[in-house]
Design a protein with these regions (language model features):
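Consensus positions within tandem repeat domains that build extended binding/scaffold surfaces
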Residues: 3-6, 26-31, 49-52, 97-99, ...
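A structural signal for leucine-rich repeat
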Residues: 263, 284-287
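Extracellular/surface-exposed low-complexity segments
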Residues: 287-310
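Structural signature of tandem-repeat unit edges
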Residues: 1, 10-24, 33-47, 56-72, ...
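Short low-complexity, flexible loop/linker segments enriched in glycine and/or proline
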Residues: 54, 146, 286-287
Length: 310
């Protein structure tokens, strides 16, 4: 694994050889490496984060060869593609974050070989009206379709935009008061409800087993929430800035709580945990249970209520 932004801004770096022990390259790893012209990427690499090679001569050269830059079945970049109608090749298995950010295309056809679409992949493609999304896609990153004509049209059909049982986006203007996610939804994508500032309550069905990062970030009027059993992690900044949040119910299936999940949740007073104190203490909470760490300070200082009434 090469972690996020590991070499970002290394302006004198000219060449990189990645060994075949590497499977994952994080986001913005080589961002701003303005002299990086040669990169050897082995076939072992199966995941590449958004903007991994942005602002490098290597990417610029690849874009000149083909505006759809594909490595190991991963579509890294299509921002320079000038076609109004884009058909992604059948050998692509995933689309990187920011891959088409701010592209002027009007339509895109995604083949059924694709299983995942990264964060902001089509964000700010204002002219994008038609998208063909196959059933094979089982993962959407954060804010994949933000500020596209396509998602605006979907709002007219339903303020909750659901694709392949994944809730990917919502119309902030229509989601007010209590919002109910329909049964059958299995995942809430990252950023799906971010800054939904008229929503005070939300009902999440038991069918949901994953909630993406930043999912409820900045929902300033959200007062309480119950996470269903089956969700195993609460990822980065999920409830960041939920100023009105006073209580949350957490199932015993949760084993991990990420960075700044409850940052600025200053009114969080009660946490209802479905397990035992021992199970609670076994949860990997970023920053630990220390009140000296601001990441999840408001979580660890709230009253924890356990299933046995203690």
């Amino acid at each position: 694994n090469i972690g996020d932004r590991s070499f970002a801004g290394c302006e004198n770096l000219t060449s990189v050889i990645i060994p075949n022990s590497v499977a994952n390259i994080g986001y913005s790893v080589f961002d701003g490496c303005t002299s990086l012209a040669e990169i050897t990427i082995p076939s072992s690499v199966t995941s590449i984060g958004g903007n991994a090679f942005v602002n490098t001569p290597w990417l610029a050269a690849r874009q000149e060869e083909n505006p759809l830059v594909i490595v190991n079945g991963i579509l890294l970049d299509g921002t320079t593609c000038t076609d109004e109608e884009i058909v992604i090749p059948n050998d692509v298995t995933s689309i990187c974050g920011f891959a088409f950010w701010e592209n002027h295309m009007t339509s895109v056809v995604i083949p059924d070989s694709v299983t995942s679409i990264g964060s902001y992949a089509f964000s700010d493609c204002g002219n994008l009206k038609n998208i063909t999304i196959p059933d094979s896609v089982t993962f959407f990153g954060e804010s994949v379709f933000t500020n596209t004509a396509w998602v605006t049209y979907r709002y007219d059909e339903n303020p909750l935009v659901i694709i392949n049982h994944i809730l990917v986006d919502v119309d902030r203007d229509q989601c007010s008061g209590k919002v109910t996610i329909p049964d059958g939804v299995t995942s809430i994508a990252g950023g799906a409800f971010a800054y939904c500032n008229q929503m005070t309550e939300i009902s999440i069905p038991d069918s949901v087993n994953s909630i993406g990062s930043f999912a409820f970030n900045g929902c300033m009027t959200l007062k309480e929430i119950a996470i269903p059993e089956g969700v195993t992690s609460i990822d980065e900044a999920t409830f960041y800035g939920c100023y009105s949040l006073t209580s949350i119910s957490i199932p015993k299936s949760v084993t991990f709580i990420g960075e700044v999940v409850f940052c600025n949740c200053m009114n969080l007073s009660d946490v209802y945990y479905a397990g035992t104190p021992e199970q609670w203490n076994a949860i990997a909470i970023t920053g630990g249970n220390s009140t000296d760490n601001y990441d999840n300070y408001f979580l660890v200082t709230a009253a924890i209520h356990f299933a046995d009434g203690t």
